[in-house]
From Swiss-Prot:
Taxon lineage: Bacteria, Pseudomonadati, Pseudomonadota, Betaproteobacteria, Burkholderiales
Record organism: Burkholderia ambifaria (strain ATCC BAA-244 / DSM 16087 / CCUG 44356 / LMG 19182 / AMMD)
Family matches, as NCBIfam families: arg_catab_astB, PRK13281.1
Binding site for substrate: 19-28, 110, 137-138, 213, 251, 364
Active site per UniProt: E174, H249, C370
SUBUNIT field: Homodimer.
Residue stretches in coiled coil: none
Name under which the protein is recorded: N-succinylarginine dihydrolase
Keyword Transferase listed: no
Keyword Ligase carried by entry: no
Primary enzyme class: hydrolase
Length: 446
């Protein structure tokens, strides 16, 4: 059956700020306490969605989550009216208010792991929301993620939306940022590739400076609950040294699509064995793996992290050629820019490079790949997504006007204590649910 890979990008929320909450994420730590521009952030992401939709790629939208999270603050012991809760948290524990106010759900690559119906045992598209248990500000996302996915992908004949795995370090799950899929065609059975940072119950190398957020046990559990064919499922360990260099998810050092793996030479432990396994497994499903390995001599790990070369989108055109979507920081790094020029001029599958200004997201450690969740859908499954979430001229105009109306153009850490920010956000999100036709999605609407 005909199928297409859709990218569902997260709309940046009204509380987008730089609180430095993500240890192991170099950009997040480096920009801590600086002022953010939520309006610019949201519009930068929206423009990327629109341009890719205009180029013929299937592009969807995922709404922001409600922030600040009064549920979290009340759980942590702050009481009273909503304004009182925010005031108490701001005075007594501003770091907790920052965690409750994070707009990190914008990075939907961490929202869930998705397996298309061509790969699963029951022939449905399976979603497992990521528990994101390594960081408080992200561990509060999965309930709302499940609600959103269950709203958009509601037909049980086509979709299965699971609960997140239990939020324990042994099952640390960071979603699709550590997962990719290879195939001959999107609608045919493929090979699912899970990358982990450490194993809870197996001896092996681990990072020493920054934590490994994804475990082997979590990856295996997701594959099992999705009913994947064991002979078409490959696991690999990310090199702990690159985690210590700031590669907190695999999508900061590697990206794959269809029959192509674009990766850094230092991305994996036992890389040649991984390449060989992927090649043999994909060959059994009718495709030949193309490995584009970037040598450290051309682009160092540090350059990869600062430019986010690999936190890119690798998209297939109808003619089979591929385009790489990168942040503008790649053009500002001389070595990375030179490599990209050489790549596009070569005879490989990647023929074009598209550059986007995503500066606001990048300063928090999120490039093009972070902002999107890939969902392969056949024609019947796409028709079952009935909400108004597919990017087109009309939706773009509505969302652009909505952002202009509701978002601030400056948000500093001290502004999180402003109780009117909660009211502004709720007003904006209430209107957004009407634009996207997703019903009463948020707690404050119920």
């Amino acid at each position: 059956m005909n199928a297409q890979e859709a990218n569902f990008d997260g709309l940046v929320g009204p509380t987008h700020n730089y609180a430095g909450l993500s240890f192991g994420n170099v950009a997040s730590l480096n920009n801590e306490k600086s002022a953010a521009n939520p309006k610019a952030a949201a519009k930068q992401g929206l423009r990327k969605m629109k341009q890719l939709a205009d180029l013929g790629f299937a592009q969807g939208v995922l709404p922001p989550q409600e922030r600040p999270s009064l549920r979290l603050l009340r759980e942590l012991g702050f009481s009273g009216k909503d304004a009182d809760v925010i005031a108490k948290a701001a005075k007594q524990a501003p770091e907790l208010l920052a965690a409750a106010s994070s707009a990190s759900a914008m990075w939907t690559a961490n929202a869930a792991t998705v397996s298309p119906s061509a790969d699963t045992g029951d022939g449905r598209v399976h979603f497992t929301p990521a528990n994101l248990c390594s960081k408080l500000h992200r561990a509060i996302e999965h309930d709302a993620t499940r609600r959103t996915l269950s709203t958009l992908f509601a037909d049980p004949a086509h979709f299965a939306v699971h609960e997140a795995l239990t939020g324990t370090p042994a099952l640390g799950d960071e979603g699709a940022a550590n997962h990719t899929r290879f195939c001959a065609e999107y609608g045919k059975p493929g090979v699912e590739f899970f990358v982990y940072g450490r194993a809870e119950y197996r001896r092996g190398p681990e990072p020493k400076r920054f934590p490994a957020r994804q475990t082997f046990e979590a990856s295996r559990a997701v594959a099992q609950r999705h009913g994947l064919d064991e002979t078409a499922t490959v696991y690999a360990q990310q090199d702990p040294d690159v985690i210590d260099a700031g590669v907190f998810h695999n999508d900061v050092i590697s990206v794959g699509n269809r029959d192509t793996l674009f990766t850094h030479e230092r991305a994996f432990v036992n890389k040649q064995a991984i390449y060989d396994t992927l090649t043999a497994t994909l060959d059994a499903r009718g495709a030949r793996l193309n490995v584009i390995e970037v040598p450290d001599a051309a682009v160092s790990v540090n350059d990869a992290v600062t430019s986010y070369l690999f936190n890119s989108q690798l998209l297939s055109r109808a003619d089979g050629s591929q385009v790489l979507v990168v942040p503008q920081e790649c053009r500002e790094n001389a070595k990375v820019a030179a490599y990209l020029d050489e790549l596009a001029a070569g005879n490989g599958p990647i023929r074009d490079v598209l550059v986007f200004d995503l500066r606001e997201s990048m300063k928090n450690g999120g490039g093009p790949a972070c902002l999107r969740l890939r969902v392969v859908l056949n024609d019947a499954e796409r028709a079952a997504v009935t909400s108004n979430v597919w990017m087109n001229d009309t939706l773009f105009a509505s969302l652009d006007a909505w952002i202009e109306k509701h978002y601030r153009d400056r948000l500093a850490p001290e502004d999180l204590a402003d109780p009117t920010l909660l009211d502004e956000s709720r007003t904006a999100l209430d209107e957004l649910t009407q634009i996207l036709r997703v019903g009463s999605l948020y707690d404050f609407q119920r």
